[in-house]
């Protein structure tokens, strides 16, 4: 749009050639988020990446097409139904190239993706602001360079993108956006004017390619399918130049003139729309079939408004959520990793002052829609229509209009809609510049927004580098969010700071009295601190609120076992296994219960079940070896130990246990080798040196025995057994010396 570019002449004074403009955009976009390159895996990264077996070579590649984003089977009732196999495939490639779970490689890919998307945005915005125009050679002319550069810079430095770029799971949104834009630009290629029959075939090819790229975008994230809707809007309103207001007037006045009807007969519009419709319907059908058991089941804490009884309350709150999303685009200062669990209290009546936000949102939207429909300036109509299209259409899957979503507000879903916001903001700056004589204040405002947003990106990227910083940054934004307190507590507990963790877990339970995961974790800490009575109360309440909470049932069983209430403990363990059949840790704890009751066969069976379900379950293997050793079944203990070491060859505790068995079987040489390997792996364990000393003592290697007794006593000076054995050895050495004399 020449007029808009002229309006921005004093704000973006020099016209950069497309190559240099893309270079500037790429550099700025990378610079803003570069700080996150060496961050940890945080928040959802743990489940989607670190704990996702689909990333590892043990899982066949074909399984990716049957699993959700988190690695669960889509057919499972507990699946979130997030079907993003291409995104998971990129994680798997990252894992392979990085040689494991090294986050730097994952983060660098995300940063580069954002840079690539920002560069592509320059071409997209050129179409939105300047329209489509091709040279005689079929190359698209880069129109409205000033407006497209400004809008792209606003997009590149928008802080709301931090979650997508700095959080590795945000790659789903980045890949979706990449193929979304490629699909849109591909659709634009369908309108080259070649003037021959081959041009029709070329047009069909580009439309089909656009649909294919839309399908790829959807396989990265579900939001990708909305590009087909945007392409249809672009075709009808921009290419077809449909004047909606004029069409409505004709319908109201029963005007039968063919002025607007001609557009449906020229340029193959109906054919292209038919292709888009067939493609979109097919994609939706296949997606629904893949989903299997129906839509995912969300809880009230995930999306409280969707569980409200009154349709009016639901509508008010949904619209309030839209206004919050709009505010995050307009003023991205209050950013939070999670907006659920009381972060945004429900609006229950029209008397709530927050209803003003709804009114403000719709006042702005209606004003923009009116301008988009009624303006006599076709360029203005195009910019506003496509700006609103980019803002609204990609947001529709997150709007709760078609199905319930599992969140209240999510910054990641604003990645694509923010492009529409940048279009509208740039258009607004152009209008402001046109109607004011002093251009420098407008330029200063734009420069200020770019610098402040860039600085905010850098700060926010730093907060996403570690879970501790990320969770603590949310306290000032959402102090009523129980999940924020829960995550801070969990992080502190992982660091070993149980006292501080208890404080945050208690606050999480206070804010949400039905927060069973906080109750479970708090109960666990209290159990470890031997505060068994309160631990039992919390865990009992957790399973009462959520009867199928297997982890809470298991932990309740551990507490009951500690309280010597063995029958209740066994029942709790059995209930946990009923709700989670493949639960190796529960079988392990059940085995410990049976061992306490001297039900040795049952204990061995339980531990064997644990190792079948989880072959690397070292504790279960160890307990089997020790129990068989203590009951005199040395041959069986040796067989189990060898089997365990074949599966977990570098486990020093298994080496130690098997070495003890071999020593008792007088296989001294092999026992010595295992003891030495265990000590090499973990040299600071007193019992390793002490038991090796006992082996040497029995074997008659008294000097070696003396050496390892002394090392063991240095590590643990109060070990009674070691002190007694060392005294016996010293007496024996003294007697030997006397005989020699």
Swiss-Prot record:
Q: What is this protein called?
A: Protein O-mannosyl-transferase TMTC4
Disruption phenotype annotation: TMTC4 conditional knockout in cochlear hair cells results in postnatal progressive hearing loss. Mutant mice have normal hearing at day P13 and are completely deaf by day P26.
Keywords tagged on the record:
Endoplasmic reticulum, Glycoprotein, Membrane, Repeat, TPR repeat, Transferase, Transmembrane, Transmembrane helix
Give residue spans on the Extracellular membrane side: 32-110, 220-224, 287-354, 404-412, 463-741
Q: What does this protein do?
A: Transfers mannosyl residues to the hydroxyl group of serine or threonine residues. The 4 members of the TMTC family are O-mannosyl-transferases dedicated primarily to the cadherin superfamily, each member seems to have a distinct role in decorating the cadherin domains with O-linked mannose glycans at specific regions. Also acts as O-mannosyl-transferase on other proteins such as PDIA3.
Its predominant location is membrane
Report the family membership: Belongs to the TMTC family.
Q: Which reaction does it catalyse?
A: a di-trans,poly-cis-dolichyl beta-D-mannosyl phosphate + L-seryl-[protein] = 3-O-(alpha-D-mannosyl)-L-seryl-[protein] + a di-trans,poly-cis-dolichyl phosphate + H(+); a di-trans,poly-cis-dolichyl beta-D-mannosyl phosphate + L-threonyl-[protein] = 3-O-(alpha-D-mannosyl)-L-threonyl-[protein] + a di-trans,poly-cis-dolichyl phosphate + H(+)
Tell whether Nucleotidyltransferase is among the UniProt keywords.
no
> GO cellular component annotations, sorted alphabetically?
endoplasmic reticulum; membrane
The chain's coiled-coil residues are none
**According to the record, which residues are glycosylated?**
77, 497, 609, 725
Domain of life, source organism? Eukaryota
Instruction: Name the SUPFAM superfamilies on file.
Output: TPR-like
Which organism does this sequence originate in? Mus musculus
Report if keyword Electron transport is assigned: no
Please name the pathway: Protein modification; protein glycosylation
**Could you tell me which residue ranges are on the Cytoplasmic side of the membrane?**
1-10, 132-146, 186-198, 246-265, 376-382, 434-441
